[in-house]
Swiss-Prot record:
InterPro entries: Ntn_hydrolases_N, Proteasome_alpha, Proteasome_alpha-type, Proteasome_alpha1, Proteasome_asu_N, Proteasome_sua/b. Residues 243-272 are annotated as: Disordered. It comes from Schizosaccharomyces pombe (strain 972 / ATCC 24843). GO terms for cellular component: cytosol; nucleus; proteasome core complex, alpha-subunit complex. CDD domains: proteasome_alpha_type_1. The 26S proteasome consists of a 20S proteasome core and two 19S regulatory subunits. The 20S proteasome core is composed of 28 subunits that are arranged in four stacked rings, resulting in a barrel-shaped structure. The two end rings are each formed by seven alpha subunits, and the two central rings are each formed by seven beta subunits. The catalytic chamber with the active sites is on the inside of the barrel. Residues 243-261 have a biased composition (Low complexity). This is Probable proteasome subunit alpha type-6. The proteasome is a multicatalytic proteinase complex which is characterized by its ability to cleave peptides with Arg, Phe, Tyr, Leu, and Glu adjacent to the leaving group at neutral or slightly basic pH. The proteasome has an ATP-dependent proteolytic activity. One of its GO terms (biological process) is proteasome-mediated ubiquitin-dependent protein catabolic process. Pfam families: Proteasome, Proteasome_A_N. Belongs to the peptidase T1A family.
Length: 272
């Protein structure tokens, strides 16, 4: 991906009007493990696939609580995520201290976007190599937003980021109309199904490699532990993409007519 003299700094434009350092930061997000976010009229959900650097190491933390009404899922460089998540926590605390109220979700993300965008304008800086999915609940209801290193923040009904995330987005696009009216349980299970589609053939969802969080009306940000995660995976049923595809194929396969159905059909064809 070497771009000659046009990728040496974030402030250097290419002749095609591109900032290659920003594009490289977006590529870092694609190297992270998949995360999925969904929102309904009452709740917002994040699920994430955790990785361990090697067999003997612990799994990397993917979901981070910012405040009682905000949480994030990260994809990309974990150290950059730590810097930005700490900044978000400070801003949330400042709002409570100065204004005695939780900071609105969009306002917090606007502050984070400004901080990230500065790194694309000043010489000697680099864009943050991490992206967020953000869920929150404030006076205007539940929210799901996506943050990108360029400083772009978009609001979604459902989305995914990270490695193999296109498979999850395909599932979300096919079922988008069902999410607004989904219950809390249905929304979590739908997010897990989308996450399951990002797995390779030899992988499956387990309580060790999956994180689940939810927020909603009269419900603070909740991050489930392994025991609770296992219960959700048991409700999901098929935990791997191969088994899920086999189940869907079996459900869609036309059934052979029974003997009673054949006899009924023959009787119906008789005429006087």
């Amino acid at each position: 991906m070497f771009r000659n003299q046009y990728d040496g700094d974030a402030t250097t434009w290419s002749p095609q009007g591109r900032l290659h350092q920003v594009e490289y930061a977006l590529e870092a997000i694609k190297q992270g493990s998949a995360t999925v976010g969904l929102v309904s009229k009452t709740h917002a959900v994040l699920v994430a696939l955790k990785r361990n650097a090697e067999e003997l190491s612990s799994y990397q933390k993917k979901l981070i609580r910012i405040d009682d009404h905000i949480g994030i899922a990260i994809a990309g460089l974990a150290p950059d995520a730590r810097v930005l998540s700490n900044y978000m926590k400070q801003e949330a605390l400042s709002s409570k201290t100065l204004f005695t109220r939780p900071i609105p979700v969009r306002r917090l993300m606007s502050k984070v976007a400004e901080k990230a965008q500065i790194n694309t304008q000043e010489y000697g800086r680099r864009p943050y190599g991490v992206g967020f999915l953000v869920i929150g609940y404030d006076e205007s209801g539940p929210h799901l937003l996506e943050f990108q290193p360029s400083g772009l923040v978009l609001e979604y009904l459902g989305t995914s980021m990270g490695s193999r995330s296109q498979s999850a987005r395909t599932y979300i696009e096919r079922n988008l109309d069902t999410f607004p009216d989904s219950s809390r349980e249905e929304l979590i299970l739908s997010a897990l199904r989308a996450l399951r589609d990002t797995l390779s053939k030899d992988q499956e969802l387990t309580e060790e490699n999956v994180s689940i969080s939810v927020i909603g009306k009269d419900e603070k940000y909740t991050l489930y532990d392994q025991n609770d995660t296992k219960e959700w995976l048991d409700k999901l049923g098929d935990k791997g993409p191969a088994a899920a595809r086999a189940s869907r194929a079996a459900a869609e396969e036309p059934q052979a007519p029974t003997a009673e159905a054949i006899l009924d059909s023959a009787d119906a064809m008789e005429t006087d």
